[in-house]
Amino acid sequence: MSQLALQMSSLGVEGEGIWLALGTIGMLLGMLYFIADGLDVQDPRQKEFYVITILIPAIAAASYLSMFFGFGLTEVSLANGRVVDVYWARYADWLFTTPLLLLDIGLLAGASQRDIGALVGIDAFMIVTGLVATLTKVVVARYAFWTISTISMVFLLYYLVAVFGEAVSDADEDTRSTFNALRNIILVTWAIYPVAWLVGTEGLALTGLYGETLLFMVLDLVAKVGFGFILLRSRAIMGGGSEPTPSAQETAAD
């Protein structure tokens, strides 16, 4: 990573712009890989997963490119006199890409439209309150909305584990295994985001914008490209999966 940073610096890209450039490249490469991988896909269900999963890094690439050129950046002057550089385009990205991630894992789990819709609604509330926490100038209000957003995230993750976990319980072993891997990616990466906000420039300012941008880039690549790679290369999507586990009702009927 440090070698890449040095090479980017030699091209005139410095500071957090290095990580924004690498984030753009990473998302574009992920998108192109998913497109190439899905060119010969004919099955309607597989196509649905490919379309959703391709859109995720495509949107993220546009967001990272806008931040790289400074279009997705603004300054917020806090009431205590501190000026914070805010990449609002990051929240625009999340407002579109996180529902698509939840749609992907919801369709994989076989969750109902109602449950997927409920989780997407919670997700949208989480992102919007997080954006309010970032843009408001009153310091106490920032932490209040951060707390609301974080509580929403905890409820979202619980809903994902409990409700989607129940929906996938009767699926075949390959589907359950893929679901568990994707669920764990969401649990780990999403849980780090509010912590990164809190210790970063938008919160306590324990880290600078350079390190904060690097952390968000790594999280985004894992949560989007890594997620998509595991999903689209799984036997649960590409076929050849094992037989579903009989439900309790089916077992009783036998």
UniProtKB/Swiss-Prot annotation:
Q: Name one GO cellular component term.
A: plasma membrane
Report the Gene3D superfamilies cross-referenced here. Rhodopsin 7-helix transmembrane proteins (1.20.1070.10)
SUPFAM superfamilies to which the protein is assigned, alphabetical: Family A G protein-coupled receptor-like
The chain residues annotated with the modification N6-(retinylidene)lysine are K224
- Membrane topology classification: Multi-pass membrane protein
Q: Which residues form a coiled coil?
A: none
**What's in the keyword line of the UniProt record?**
Cell membrane, Chromophore, Hydrogen ion transport, Ion transport, Membrane, Photoreceptor protein, Pyrrolidone carboxylic acid, Receptor, Retinal protein, Sensory transduction, Transmembrane, Transmembrane helix, Transport
Q: Which residues form the propeptide?
A: 1-6
Segments spanning the bilayer are 16-36, 51-71, 91-111, 116-136, 144-164, 185-205, 212-232
PTM comment: the record says: The covalent binding of retinal to the apoprotein, bacterioopsin, generates bacteriorhodopsin.
Cellular compartments annotated? Cell membrane
What Pfam families has UniProt attached to this entry? Bac_rhodopsin
Q: Where are the Pyrrolidone carboxylic acid residues found in this chain? A: Q7
The protein's matches in InterPro entries, at most eight in alphabetical order, are given as:
Arc/bac/fun_rhodopsins (IPR001425), Rhodopsin_retinal_BS (IPR018229)
GO MF, one term, reads: monoatomic ion channel activity
Report the record's Gene Ontology biological process terms: phototransduction; proton transmembrane transport
The site feature described as Primary proton acceptor is recorded at D93
Q: What else is known?
A: Different protein aggregation states can be observed, leading to variations in the absorbance maxima.
Q: What does this protein do?
A: Light-driven proton pump. The chromophore contains 78% all-trans- and 22% 13-cis-retinal in the dark and 90% all-trans- and 10% 13-cis-retinal upon illumination with >500 nm light.
| UniProt similarity note | Belongs to the archaeal/bacterial/fungal opsin family.
**Name of this chain's protein:** Bacteriorhodopsin-I
Protein species of origin: Haloquadratum walsbyi (strain DSM 16790 / HBSQ001)
Encoding gene, per UniProt annotation: bop1
